[in-house]
């Protein structure tokens, strides 16, 4: 676990395995955070501060966390590099957690974990993100693959733990373009920390095809607690999602993906 009020990563190859938070930009101490482990109460939670900043400008970062994967009590900025978060399996934590907002402007971001406190990138982010939700948790090692309209793999990833949500952002996800999200199946590529390169993806089940209409676009039928941060990230657009502001469900309800039941 790395706890400092301000954390900036510009380069390097970093791998973190933590029973609690992976990176935590907080004014609290390690002892404070240990006392709030799994509950995110006390000094590690709620004390929003403009002094707390987590900047990722480059490098390769892999985080396997039992608590929040990336946590900032202020702003989180991701502008480059490759960031992979194998986040929590419990709904009391999130793969990403900020006090105010998460700004994504570049790089590759993959953050998998539970859905109860999943936080999305801000709607002011300049690089689009797909927020993929599953109504039931999927087993560790289940592949999630995003393909563009030409059937080319954009991201092929398999978390190391069970998960019900994945946040994916990449320079190859372009606003206004359509993308198909598959789960299951297999890949002949080479995996590092669950992220596949090269090879062919096959045998998966189509979850949904969506258009990246805004900074954050939701796919799938999973619901999100959206309780992680104080300021919260952006709310996902379209695709039959619950409208928490107005307390409304879509008229036609949710469409359950093939092979999954309510």
Question: Model-flagged regions — what are they?
Answer:
Residues 4-262:
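A composition-driven surface/loop motif
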């Amino acid at each position: 676990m790395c706890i400092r009020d301000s954390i900036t990563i510009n380069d390097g190859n970093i791998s973190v395995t933590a029973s609690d938070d992976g990176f935590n930009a907080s004014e609290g101490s390690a002892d404070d955070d240990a006392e709030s482990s799994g509950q995110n109460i006390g000094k590690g939670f709620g004390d929003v501060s403009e002094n707390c900043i987590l900047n990722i400008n480059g490098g390769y970062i892999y985080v396997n966390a039992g608590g929040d994967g990336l946590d900032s009590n202020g702003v989180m900025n991701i502008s480059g590099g490759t960031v992979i978060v194998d986040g929590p399996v419990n709904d009391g934590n999130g793969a990403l957690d900020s006090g105010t907002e998460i700004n994504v402007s570049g790089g590759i971001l993959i953050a998998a974990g539970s859905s109860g406190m999943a936080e999305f990138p801000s709607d002011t982010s300049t690089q689009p993100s797909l927020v993929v939700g599953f109504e039931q948790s999927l087993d560790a090692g289940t592949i999630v693959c995003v393909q563009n309209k030409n059937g080319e793999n954009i991201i092929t990833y398999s978390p190391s733990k069970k998960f019900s949500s994945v946040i994916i952002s990449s320079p190859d996800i372009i606003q206004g373009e359509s993308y198909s999200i598959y789960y299951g199946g297999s890949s002949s590529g080479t995996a590092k920390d669950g992220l596949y390169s090269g090879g062919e993806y096959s045998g998966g089940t189509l979850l949904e095809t969506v258009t990246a209409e805004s900074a954050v676009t939701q796919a799938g039928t999973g619901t999100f607690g959206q309780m992680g941060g104080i300021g919260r990230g952006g709310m996902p657009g379209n695709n039959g999602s619950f409208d928490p502001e107005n307390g409304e469900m879509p008229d036609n309800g949710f469409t359950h993906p093939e092979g999954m039941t309510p």
